[in-house]
């Protein structure tokens, strides 16, 4: 038996950093996917093949605590811990231990802040659980994905695996999630080609908050109110043009507030301003900042904005919101 599953990447639409201080955030799944094929093998080991994950690939197998590297190339190795923990958790759920081979291909750049780790964990859980005969709901997959992140990272809000498992728009605050109606946003993601350390950037904001609470607290409060306004706009019965304009304005304000927190970089700002000049209604950082990605809302201007991002030194990815989260693509008996 062979199962092929896929799970999407995500962007933080509004509310990164302020979410750490109990404010809400809105995230969305986007139409870039990681694909995981799972099948049983005869040697009793877990074997992982990652041949195309937007970095050079690797093949590795392990048994108990021993890892057998057949190739090892850079950041591709980061998928190992997420995949292994995902498989182990599914085996615990199924109360079975068998040799499994998983093959991974992905459209999601690793280390870009687009939730590549969560997507590979969710797709692995989806494929391997079906292989073992489990029928998990998207919510159950999301919970297992959150467990994987806790095991590997030590801390996780659960936003990334929840968005990847369920898809669409997700409103998050203090551990609770609410699905929002999907607005078909024509977006362009711009990748700087570098990534900042989320841990270091969060610590930087925390330091400024502790040293100057009277300055930083109003910024965080404004970001929280901005997310509530964005939720209002998403839920409102506006026509598409008005909705896009209002969301674009909120994106621009949110970027300015993130810049005030000190988490932007020149390369990110170059992509943001190039996008706006090319006709985007809004453009902002998505994720922790310090590198990674921005995104632009560009109705009828995606091609022009993508070109502007490329000229400004970024890697443009023209995409859209994914209504679907985890998807079982194929089952071969």
Curated annotation (Swiss-Prot):
Instruction: Please list the residues that bind ATP.
Output: 109-119
- Known pathway: Isoprenoid biosynthesis; isopentenyl diphosphate biosynthesis via mevalonate pathway; isopentenyl diphosphate from (R)-mevalonate: step 1/3
What's its EC? 2.7.1.36
Q: Which GO terms describe its molecular function?
A: ATP binding; magnesium ion binding; mevalonate kinase activity
Is Lipid biosynthesis tagged as a keyword?
yes
Kindly report, in one word, the top-level EC class recorded for this enzyme: transferase
Q: Name one GO biological process term.
A: isopentenyl diphosphate biosynthetic process, mevalonate pathway
This protein's record includes keyword Nucleotide-binding = yes
Lineage, top-rank taxon, reads Archaea
Could you tell me what reaction this enzyme catalyses? Answer: (R)-mevalonate + ATP = (R)-5-phosphomevalonate + ADP + H(+)
| Annotated Pfam families | GHMP_kinases_C, GHMP_kinases_N
Keywords for this entry?
ATP-binding, Cytoplasm, Isoprene biosynthesis, Kinase, Lipid biosynthesis, Lipid metabolism, Magnesium, Nucleotide-binding, Transferase
Q: Which InterPro entries match?
A: GHMP_kinase_C_dom, GHMP_kinase_C_sf, GHMP_kinase_N_dom, GHMP_knse_ATP-bd_CS, Mev_gal_kin, Mevalonate_kinase_arc, Ribosomal_Su5_D2-typ_SF, Ribsml_uS5_D2-typ_fold_subgr
Under the heading PANTHER family, the entry gives:
MEVALONATE KINASE
Self-association state and partner proteins as the record states:
Homodimer.
Q: Which NCBIfam families match?
A: mevalon_kin, PRK03926.1
Record's protein name: Mevalonate kinase
